[in-house]
């Protein structure tokens, strides 16, 4: 889920940047919708390349719902989008409801959307602007860890003791180095020999 989300975000941002470079596309075209469509195509390609296992399908559906919401001018990250993704996943695979993967991914996503929605709507600046990227990683890791801990304990009789620390180290690395390098490699692959 994280990889697909990061890939979609990188492609969305790159497409918006490319469209902003020319005055016609910057002002006359629906650049947000076009960028969301490009990100959806990239996510679809990632789904095809990854083999389309259940976890990747679930991440793709959640990502596709968010990107389609952007294409039609709606808020991409909302509890409604999470609910729509859940309905689609359960329609395609009803047995997923009892699996730890479904429960943990939707618990984490619901908690993250709720917490960041509350923070977005909160009046005033609690966190200084320059610290927000770091705070977002810490908050995301903590919220996801707390949301999934009871489910992990119920299914596996254990909780991840070092999950917060591991995420604090791996998420920035994935977002800044690995995913952009993978996108660049995929774009340049037809050119190379």
Model-inferred region functions:
Residues 158-166, 184-193:
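Membrane-interfacial interhelical loops
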């Amino acid at each position: 889920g994280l990889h697909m989300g990061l890939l979609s975000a990188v492609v969305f941002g790159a497409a918006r940047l490319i469209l902003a470079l020319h005055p016609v596309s910057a002002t006359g075209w629906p650049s947000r919708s076009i960028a969301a469509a490009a990100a959806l195509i990239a996510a679809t390609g990632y789904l095809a390349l990854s083999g389309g296992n259940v976890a990747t399908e679930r991440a793709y559906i959640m990502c596709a719902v968010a990107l389609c919401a952007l294409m039609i001018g709606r808020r991409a990250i909302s509890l409604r989008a999470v609910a729509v993704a859940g309905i689609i996943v359960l329609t395609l695979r009803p047995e997923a409801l009892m699996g730890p993967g479904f429960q943990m991914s939707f618990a984490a996503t619901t908690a993250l959307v709720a917490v960041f929605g509350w923070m977005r709507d909160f009046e005033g600046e609690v966190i200084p602007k320059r610290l927000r990227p770091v705070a977002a990683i810490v908050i995301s890791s903590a919220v996801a860890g707390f949301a999934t801990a009871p489910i992990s304990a119920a299914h596996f009789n254990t909780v991840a003791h070092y999950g917060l620390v591991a995420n604090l180290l791996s998420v920035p690395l994935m977002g800044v180095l690995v995913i952009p390098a993978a996108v660049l490699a995929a774009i340049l692959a037809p050119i190379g020999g």
